[in-house]
Amino acid sequence: MLPPTVLAASVLKDPLTLFLAGLSLLVLFLWYFATDYEARKRNIGTVLLVGICALCALAIYPPKDNLKGGIDLVGGSSFTLLVKPKIDEVTLQPIPLTKDDLKQARATIEKRVNAYGNIDMLAVEQGTDKILLQMPGMAPEESAAIKELLQKVARLELKEVNLEGGVPGSDGRPLAERIHTGDEPRVPGFKVYEQKYKNEDGTELSTYLLLNNRSALTGKDVQQAWPDSMAGGHSVSINLTNAGADKMIALTKDMTPGRDRIAVVLDGEVITAPVVQSVPLGKRFQIEGQDSQEEARSLANAMMNPLENPLEIIEERTISPTLGAAVVKQGMWSGIMGLCITAVFVLIYYRTAGLVALFGLLVNGLLIFGGMAMFNFTFTLAGIAGMILSIGMAVDANVLIYERLREEIAAGKSLKTAINAAYEKAFTAIFDSNLTSLITAVILYWMGSSSIKGFAITLTIGILASMFSAILVTRVLFRWCNDLNLLKKLSFLDLIKASKIDFLSKSKLAYVISGLLVAASVGAVAMRGENSMGIDFTGGSLVEFQLGEEKSLSQPEVEKALAGIQVSKRPIVQVEKSITGELVTIRCATGDADKIAAHLRGSFDILGEKETEDGKDRYVIEQSTQGVSATLGKDFLIDSAIALALGLLGILTYITIRFEFSFALGGFIALLHDVVLSAGLVILIGGELSLIHVGALLTIAGYSINDTIVIFDRIRESLKSGEGDVKELMNEAINATLSRTILTSLTTIVTVGIIAIFGGSALKDFSVMILIGLVIGTYSSVFIASPVVLWWSQRKGGSLRKEVLHTSLAESDIQAIR
């Protein structure tokens, strides 16, 4: 009998059970915010907390099955795919491959295998006719499904059936069958296809059809394909594009209902050839006969991403992690150390309230890991570092609440009243800052490539977990403490005293400093050119040494040997295993390939060993070198730029609605400033931009806008309630949030700094950029964003106070959902 936890986890794999559980929790969530009765709100919140935590825990259990590591952590499988030429429909001759064919095949593979961005995979063009695909470790059934999906061309064609092919000859056999057996000559412009089917007792039979060589419609005319259940079986429903619908009408308008037929051909096989029942046909039809819903889903996925050229898996290998075990362990421990230091700081600074915050952070972590397990995400080291960072940043919401709580207690309010007031006043800042990040995440998912989609889902899970743990979890815990009289009073350290700094008067100096830094960054990019981009962006060469079954080299040995060589770009080393033995591969810049190969032959005897053949010396272990494409090409950069631009536009629109256009402009310029400087300064200090930096930049963008919104929220509050000069009120608001700004930045910088120092080279690039972004983001929120708001409002001659009052949403609109 299965253990209860395993049984419960297996039950939750059922979609209906998961849907009902989610629906129940949603009802509780809405009920929690709808009720005003404190005791009821406390009880509903408790049930909701326990339910969501239980759901996440069961999604994670057992961790070894549900928390899957990426290529960098656990290695995986490597497939070498041969891209075959397609056949000309008229001449039936192979069409030579082009670079565009290889590019299309690679893009299609990425969309098929990683449509949601939840898998850590690598796909690069190799040579002139191959694609190298690497994926994290998979179960045998998953590997078999991936292989089938990779080689399924899903080339859909609709062809007119020549009815003469069914006319029987003197021997009683139809014309199409006699052509197939060679007893009749071919009919020009037509080709014989075999259609397989099963009779009533399950015996497989064949019939032959004479079809037009030219396809009336192809997969390019498919707008949408999805699995559909039908009585007695499964099918794939297809919607055609407008152009495809026009072709279908042109094909069928002159047909005779009840007589003429159309054949649906998939990958050269006739799936069905129904008799047309009415004319003309329109946009939608079905392909029937799939044996299971999963088969129908796989076919629909392939048809939405059809290959122009057939693929063949010519080699499969097991690959080592791109990071060694010691490096992975080092990175993990550094992250845990950073979080522990943050936890100790929160406990010392906020004391009893710090315990409540830590409980909220533990729930936050559980929700993030549970969400990742539910979406079947693979965990990379950078992803884990990003989650550690997001948990560290989740401290921000607690700091916001506690700094408000400090103010309310200082104003002489009772503890219960002070707690309620603190949550009420901090809510708008938490809501606005998280919602702007959520807008960005949605747009990134909608517009981005698979890698960007993965980041967007991770960001969304982190945002929702952070809001839930800060607003609901800690609030419920405080309610229990109050109702059970466990909490008599709260005290905090007060290391950051109230200040009266005139930040806005220093804006001109800040503009000069930022201008010089931007100029230096742009200059560094211009001077270094392509050298500022890593292999992920530029592509390069793949150097391979086939060691065979008797010889071996470890990944750390090769990496250590390459550490002492001067190269233009950092190489990426992997050790792969196949039935022919070990293979050492190095992805490097094209100009570094020969230098790296020579250095390795001089460093390892097994690579430098020679033998004499026909009077000539040759290496026992030969090397092969061939070009590989960028893992992040121009399309990725264009998609990312468009997604980021739309995300900025979404933020601009939201801040304009919630605040005023002056605030939107200030936030936009500060965000752009932070992203440009973070990337530019990394290049300026000699770094190379790679895939890991893309995630870092997106994280910085989210942190930056979050920091800015918190200050904007306090400025808005001051303008609504305070009298006096606008500039003075803005300075007071910035000073009021200074303790929160410093505390949040400090805790996050400590966490990331420890990862940078002790996390090893694997995490150095990621954490250094994050550190730069944190410092710049904190600086710009105070010295760039707010001064731009004041400058723009003064430039157009309006009253910022009146504009805020007119354009802000009514507080009751937000209060209603608390």
Residue ranges and their predicted role:
Residues L205-I319, A326-V327, G331-M332, P556-I621, ...:
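Extracytoplasmic
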Residues F29-N43, S237, T241-G258, I262-A263, ...:
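Interfacial segments of transmembrane alpha-helices in multi-pass membrane proteins
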Residues I109, T322-C340, M393, K413-S449, ...:
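Pore- and gate-forming transmembrane helices of large, multi-pass membrane proteins
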Residues E89-V275, F285, K634, Y654:
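Non-transmembrane, solvent-exposed regions of membrane trafficking/translocation machinery
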Residues G45-C56, L355-N376, M387-A394, F455-A470, ...:
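Small-residue-enriched core segments of transmembrane alpha-helices in multipass membrane transport
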Residues F29-E38, T46, V50-G76, T80-L92, ...:
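Transmembrane helices with small-residue packing motifs
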Residues G370, E407-T428, D432-L517, F758-R818:
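Hydrophobic alpha-helical transmembrane segments of membrane transport and translocation systems
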Residues G392-S433, R479-L486, G687-T744, L790-L805:
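Cytosolic juxtamembrane regions of multi-pass inner-membrane proteins
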